[in-house]
């Protein structure tokens, strides 16, 4: 588990380095996470939580430190670059993002196999990005998605 999380951290740090701006960074990170979700059956997460408390604690710590900090930094970056709205608290939005991931992975609302995690995450991140970007960012996002 620690090796997997280390690999994830390295991949997400790489996305920051390779990205042109905060939108690209979030798109690269999201694509990676979406691909990871594609292979996860939510019952596995439930089993980890129920039967492997130590592993679950590691996952929770990773989510509420590394992921939260990464999203918060992304929001500050987007505001600084002038492509995200600047009229909200980045910490609140980052916590909402992590909470949304919990909701997606929980399996109570988006039951598997009716709702595939990768599809739910893709829709959630699309909604998240569109809520972050201002008009300049939206223009960039639309061009970026059109050329993807």
Task: Report each predicted region and the residues it spans.
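Hydrophobic alpha-helical connector segments
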Residues: 10-43, 94-97
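Short secondary-structure transition hinges
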Residues: 35-72, 80-92
């Amino acid at each position: 588990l620690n090796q997997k999380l280390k690999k994830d951290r390295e991949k997400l740090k790489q996305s920051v380095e390779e990205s042109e701006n905060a939108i690209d960074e979030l798109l690269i990170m999201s694509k990676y996470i979406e691909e990871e979700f594609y292979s996860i059956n939510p019952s596995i997460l439930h089993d980890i939580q129920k039967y492997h408390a130590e592993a679950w604690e590691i996952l929770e710590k990773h989510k509420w430190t590394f992921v939260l900090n990464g999203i918060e930094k992304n929001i500050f970056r987007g505001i600084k670059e002038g492509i995200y709205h600047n009229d909200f608290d980045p910490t609140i939005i980052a916590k909402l993002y992590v909470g949304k991931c919990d909701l997606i992975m929980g399996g109570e609302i988006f039951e598997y196999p009716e709702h595939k995690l990768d599809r739910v995450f893709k829709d959630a991140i699309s909604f998240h990005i569109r809520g972050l970007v201002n008009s300049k960012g939206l223009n960039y996002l639309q061009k970026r998605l059109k050329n993807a």
